[in-house]
Amino acid sequence: MEVTGLSAPTVNVFISSSLNSFRSQKRYSRSLTVAEFKCKLQLVVGSPASCMELELYGPDDKFCCKLDQDDALLGSYPVDDGCRIHVIDHSGARLGEYEDISKVEKYEISQEAYEQRQDSIRSFLKRNKLGRFNEEERAQQEAENSQRLIEEEAQASTIPVGSRCEVRTPGQPPRRGTVMYVGLTDFKPGYWIGIRYDEPLGKNDGSVNGKRYFECQAKYGAFVKPSVVTVGDFPEEDYGLDEM
């Protein structure tokens, strides 16, 4: 069978399994590798990714081909809307075993024994260099995070504490206030700007998760990224919140 790439970025398919009697309809990106696709299917059918064999059936439910190349893209197979992907489980589990979790016996294994197993999720991820085992992807992610931090630090350095500012975030009207905090935080990575708004348009009182970064009334404080803050001559506006 000829295998061709399809242009639509996502596809709606039905998922069935040799372990259960129901079908699920899901949407997936064609840019996933088969190995990555198997990892996502774990949450749908319950089978370990390393124990899956995938079969593709057309919208007419006739067998098309096997998805047997872990490094191939899902979109390189003739997968189209309405197709069915059937998961054959080779873990030794029985039909219906994963349908009622109350019947699943708790299984414990030592870390050392788990590391030696070749059919484990961790072994599958290592073998296919997915997730945290993809050194190149992880290094690229770390480089992007470092570059983002450098850019945020440069932006934050132009925003002095005590200055008047205007905050513009997508989907919200401009809000004015005073810069009360500039720097790193414990609640999320990167540089953040603590704002005391002129009106109760914020989310906190200058503290997050029990740690205080600045003082203000409840609902007057907020933390935003430097990129949405403009410092300048922004006098207080009358929002009409005191009118009866």
From Swiss-Prot:
Residue numbers bearing the N6-acetyllysine modification: K219
Keywords linked to the UniProt accession: Acetylation, Chaperone, Cytoplasm, Cytoskeleton, Developmental protein, Differentiation, Microtubule, Neurogenesis, Phosphoprotein, Ubl conjugation
Location of Phosphotyrosine modifications: Y98
Positions bearing N-acetylmethionine: M1
A GO CC term attached to the entry: cytoplasm
Short name of any one Pfam family annotated for the protein: Ubiquitin_2
Residues recorded with modification Phosphoserine: S110
Main localization of the protein described in the UniProt heading: cytoplasm
Classification via CDD domains: Ubl_TBCB (cd01789)
PROSITE patterns for the chain: CAP_GLY_1 (PS00845), CAP_GLY_2 (PS50245)
Location of the protein in the cell: Cytoplasm; Cytoplasm, Cytoskeleton
BP terms from Gene Ontology: cell differentiation; cytoplasmic microtubule organization; nervous system development; post-chaperonin tubulin folding pathway; tubulin complex assembly
Subunit structure: Supercomplex made of cofactors A to E. Cofactors A and D function by capturing and stabilizing tubulin in a quasi-native conformation. Cofactor E binds to the cofactor D-tubulin complex; interaction with cofactor C then causes the release of tubulin polypeptides that are committed to the native state. Cofactors B and E can form a heterodimer which binds to alpha-tubulin and enhances their ability to dissociate tubulin heterodimers. Interacts with GAN. Interacts with DCTN1.
Role summary: Binds to alpha-tubulin folding intermediates after their interaction with cytosolic chaperonin in the pathway leading from newly synthesized tubulin to properly folded heterodimer. Involved in regulation of tubulin heterodimer dissociation. May function as a negative regulator of axonal growth.
Name of the protein: Tubulin-folding cofactor B
Lineage, uppermost ranks: Eukaryota, Metazoa, Chordata, Craniata, Vertebrata
